[in-house]
C-alpha cells in the first residue's frame, strides 16, 4: 500500500510539471514567413492583440519587438496614425512612445501595428525574463486622445517561458538562414 501511494504521489507531481510546461509552450505561436520568423503571444485582455518577436533571415542576433492593438473605433482619420509615435505606459512606467507602422482594416474595426524597436536578442530576452507579465497602456498625449482611436487602450501578456521561446525563435531563424542544398538533375 505504501509503495502504491509513493508511486501515485510521484506520478501526480510528474503530471503537474508536464502540464504546466506544456501550458506555457502552448501560449506561444511560432511561424516562418517569407524570410522572417517570429514568436507571438496572445493578449490576456484582447486575445487578438499580439506581442510579437520577429527575426529576419540572416539577421538572427537582432529581434524586432512588435505589438498589435485591435479597435472597433472607426474615426475617419485613423489612417493618419501610420508613422506616428503614440504615447504609452509600459508596466506602469510613463514616458514611452511606440511607432505605428501599419493601420489596416480588420474584421469589424482596425488593427494597428506598433514597433517597440529592434534589440539584440540576448539583451531583450534577459530583460523580459525578469518580468512575469508585459503590459502596455495607450495613453493621452500632446494632441492625441487614446479613446478616440482605441476602445480598449490596454493589454497584457504573460511571459511564461520567454527564455525558451527566444531560443526557439533564434533556432528557427538560423535554420531559415542556412543555404538550401540544390540537387543536380
How would you describe each model-predicted region?
Residues 23-185:
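A generic "folded-domain core" signal
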Residues 1-24:
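Classical Sec-dependent N-terminal signal peptides that target proteins to the secretory pathway
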